[in-house]
Every structure is written in C-alpha cells, then in structure tokens.
A protein has these predicted regions:
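A short, conserved alpha-helix within the catalytic core of class I
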Residues: 40-54
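Residues lining the SAM
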Residues: 33-38, 62
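A short acidic, Gly/Pro-enriched loop at the edge of an enzyme's catalytic core
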Residues: 21, 25-34
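Conserved beta-strand signature within the Rossmann-like core of class I S-adenosyl-L-methionine
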Residues: 56-69
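Class I SAM-dependent methyltransferase SAM/SAH-binding core
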Residues: 1-23
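Core SAM-dependent methyltransferase catalytic element
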Residues: 101-124
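Short alpha-helix
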Residues: 77-93, 97-100
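Acceptor-substrate binding/catalytic loop of class I
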Residues: 69-85, 106-108
C-alpha cells in the first residue's frame, strides 16, 4: 500500500481500501477511464464494474480459469472463470481488443482468462 500511495501522490491516482463483497459498492455512480482487475473473481460485481467504465473507457481483466484445478489453487469453480465468461460480460457493450483463455507457465503454471475491451459510445 505504501508504494501505491506514493504513486497516487505523484500521478493523481486515488487509492481506496474497501470490502467489495460484503459492503455497499464504495464508488457510487462514478465512472472511470480504465479499470484493471487481476487475480480476483466475485461474479456479482460484474455489472458494477461494467457500469463504472466511462464511454470509450477500457477494461483489463485477468484471473484464473476453468482447468486451473490441475495446477492447485484456486480450484473451487466459484473462483474460476467458465470458458468465454469474460466475453459474455462485455458482449454488446464493449469492443474486444484482445482476449485469451490459456495455460501460462510463469510465474507458475495456471489456466487464465484475460481480456482488454473498450466501451462503445459515450457512457454506460
């Protein structure tokens, strides 16, 4: 958090600690030019994340996918994306720039799904 706070001070980035799963959505109706999510999956947040991306904003999302149970944790299907799930999340609202559903070898073997998508139009 210290490194992030230092970056925020110089780059105009706002940092926030929030419980995204058990508390109210902490960002209200705000929208952002970009949202990056890594190694995290709580499906009920998908609509909130999508709605929080401004017109022509970008979503970059990468997390573990089905098949990862072969390599270790996470292995619970609740924490693994289903095939094509990120494509479904952005369908009809975003233009997909890049998408992968694959096995990686570094930093350790894992199945991941990743997407970079741009919101079409001027707003949510």
């Amino acid at each position: 958090m210290e490194a992030l706070a230092a970056l925020a001070a110089t780059a105009g980035i706002e940092t926030r600690v929030a419980d995204l799963e058990n508390a109210a959505w902490p960002l209200g109706e705000r929208s952002f030019g970009a949202i990056v999510v890594t190694n995290y999956l709580h499906r009920p947040l998908f609509p909130r994340i999508v709605a929080a991306i401004a017109g022509n904003g970008v979503l970059i999302y990468e997390t573990f996918a089905a098949g990862n149970e072969r390599f270790g944790k996470p292995s619970n299907p609740d924490f693994l994306l289903r095939p094509g799930e990120l494509l479904d999340v952005v369908a009809g609202k975003f233009r997909v720039i890049a998408y992968e559903d694959l096995q990686i070898g570094e930093p350790k073997p894992a199945m991941v799904q990743r997407i970079c998508a741009m919101r079409s139009g001027v707003g949510p």
